[in-house]
């Protein structure tokens, strides 16, 4: 029994290596086949295997993703030689599910996701980066955007606060404070 095991595995290797019998069910060979056909990107068994002109083996889904994420610089992930969809050759052999070109079936594009905007508290009208800064150009008292400002067109400011809210009270206080400061400056200009 001990001598029968090694000779059986040797005959299986001989028939799979050069014989026309085709497939074998030996577990020793599947381990060797897995190590022979490894993708150079995911380092797993190559599914829908393609080989580049420089001789490197890849899964087509892995290589497709590699090429899609680098559209301006399409190089081989291993040796940095030029590579594209047309410069790879599909491999057909044992273990392949069909004789269809793997380059014809591209992986589906993932759905886009739009996150909800963040709600920022406090005064949103101050600062240059948040859209609170507004500028209009004009000559003298006639700004070019007079109609846009008169009819509130393309205005990025938030709506006024509802009377009775703490924001409304704060805005009224600031308005009165700035009016008082303006009156003091005008009075100082008159007496100076």
UniProtKB/Swiss-Prot annotation:
Ranges of compositional bias, category Polar residues: 1-14
Membrane spanning residue stretches: 131-151, 172-192
Ranges where the record places region Required for ubiquitin ligase activity and protection against ER stress-induced cell death: 29-80
Biased composition (Low complexity): 15-27
GO cellular component: endoplasmic reticulum; endoplasmic reticulum membrane; mitochondrial outer membrane
Topology versus the membrane: Multi-pass membrane protein
Alphabetically ordered keywords of this record: Autophagy, Endoplasmic reticulum, Immunity, Innate immunity, Membrane, Metal-binding, Mitochondrion, Mitochondrion outer membrane, Transferase, Transmembrane, Transmembrane helix, Ubl conjugation pathway, Zinc, Zinc-finger
SMART domains per the UniProt record, alphabetical: RING
GO MF entry, a single one: ubiquitin binding
Ranges of the Mitochondrial intermembrane topological domain: 152-171
GO biological process: autophagy; defense response to virus; ERAD pathway; innate immune response; positive regulation of ERAD pathway; positive regulation of innate immune response; positive regulation of type I interferon-mediated signaling pathway; protein autoubiquitination
InterPro entries assigned to the protein according to its UniProt record, in alphabetical order: RNF5/RNF185-like, Znf_C3HC4_RING-type, Znf_RING, Znf_RING/FYVE/PHD, Znf_RING_CS
Subcellular location: Mitochondrion outer membrane; Endoplasmic reticulum membrane
Reaction it catalyzes: S-ubiquitinyl-[E2 ubiquitin-conjugating enzyme]-L-cysteine + [acceptor protein]-L-lysine = [E2 ubiquitin-conjugating enzyme]-L-cysteine + N(6)-ubiquitinyl-[acceptor protein]-L-lysine
Topological domain ranges for the Cytoplasmic compartment: 1-130
Superkingdom, taxonomy of origin: Eukaryota
Region named Disordered: 1-30, 90-123
Zinc finger feature spans (RING-type): 39-80
Entry annotated with the keyword Magnesium: no
Pathway annotation: Protein modification; protein ubiquitination
Broad class of where this protein is predominantly found: mitochondrion
Purpose: E3 ubiquitin-protein ligase that regulates selective mitochondrial autophagy by mediating 'Lys-63'-linked polyubiquitination of BNIP1. Acts in the endoplasmic reticulum (ER)-associated degradation (ERAD) pathway, which targets misfolded proteins that accumulate in the endoplasmic reticulum (ER) for ubiquitination and subsequent proteasome-mediated degradation. Protects cells from ER stress-induced apoptosis. Responsible for the cotranslational ubiquitination and degradation of CFTR in the ERAD pathway.
Description of its domains: The RING-type zinc finger domain is responsible for E3 ubiquitin ligase activity.
Binding partners and assembly: Interacts with ATG5 and BNIP1.
PANTHER family in the record: E3 UBIQUITIN-PROTEIN LIGASE RNF5-RELATED
Protein name from the UniProt record: E3 ubiquitin-protein ligase RNF185
Organism of this sequence: Rattus norvegicus (Rat)
